[in-house]
């Protein structure tokens, strides 16, 4: 008669060792890589937009969005490991938002797109 002890015995040699934790982590690694992809140059000029006071925006960090300078979720579907920069406008005004993704003041343009490094880069390539 087989009792509860039979169920708890170690697997026979040669049997496939299933590790649910490893299986889950390898699945997660496909969608959330440990080393995020680098941002790519979306455009080499900033985009001027009117931000409305109190409204929350999501600025594209990865450079892959088709709705530049804002996020459309491309970072998730292309498995970049990057996330958009969420910010709230303090006042209604026109601003230049960076699309080269090299700014030191994200999401705002700081003129870095004029640098030789950005101008030599191809649109869609990482810096």
UniProtKB/Swiss-Prot annotation:
Species assigned in the record: Homo sapiens (Human)
Residues modified to N6-succinyllysine: 55
Localization per record: Mitochondrion
Subunit structure: Monomer.
Consequence when changing residue 75 to C: Increases iron-sulfur cluster stability
Family matches, as PANTHER family: CDGSH IRON SULFUR DOMAIN PROTEIN HOMOLOG, CDGSH IRON-SULFUR DOMAIN-CONTAINING PROTEIN 3, MITOCHONDRIAL
Record's cofactor remark: Binds 2 [2Fe-2S] clusters per subunit.
Coarse class of the protein's main subcellular location: mitochondrion
Gene from which the chain derives: CISD3
Residues binding [2Fe-2S] cluster 2: 98, 100, 109, 113
GO cellular component terms given for this protein: mitochondrion
UniProt keywords, alphabetically: 2Fe-2S, Acetylation, Iron, Iron-sulfur, Metal-binding, Mitochondrion, Transit peptide
Keyword Acetylation on entry: yes
UniProt keyword Protein biosynthesis, yes or no: no
Pfam families, per the entry: zf-CDGSH
Binding-site list for [2Fe-2S] cluster 1: 60, 62, 71, 75
Name this protein carries in UniProt: CDGSH iron-sulfur domain-containing protein 3, mitochondrial
Family membership: Belongs to the CISD protein family.
N6-acetyllysine: residues carrying this PTM: 55, 86
């Amino acid at each position: 008669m087989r009792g509860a002890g039979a169920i708890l015995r170690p697997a026979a040699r040669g049997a496939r060792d299933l590790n649910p934790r490893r299986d889950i982590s390898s699945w997660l690694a496909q969608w959330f890589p440990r080393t995020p992809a680098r941002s790519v140059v979306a455009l080499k000029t900033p985009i001027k937009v009117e931000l409305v006071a109190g409204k929350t925006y999501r600025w594209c960090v990865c450079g892959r969005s088709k709705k530049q300078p804002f996020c459309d979720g491309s970072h998730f579907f292309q498995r970049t490991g990057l996330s958009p920069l969420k910010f709230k406008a303090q006042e209604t005004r026109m601003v230049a938002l960076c699309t080269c993704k090299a700014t030191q003041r994200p999401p705002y343009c700081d003129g870095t797109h004029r640098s030789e490094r950005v101008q030599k880069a191809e649109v869609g390539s990482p810096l």
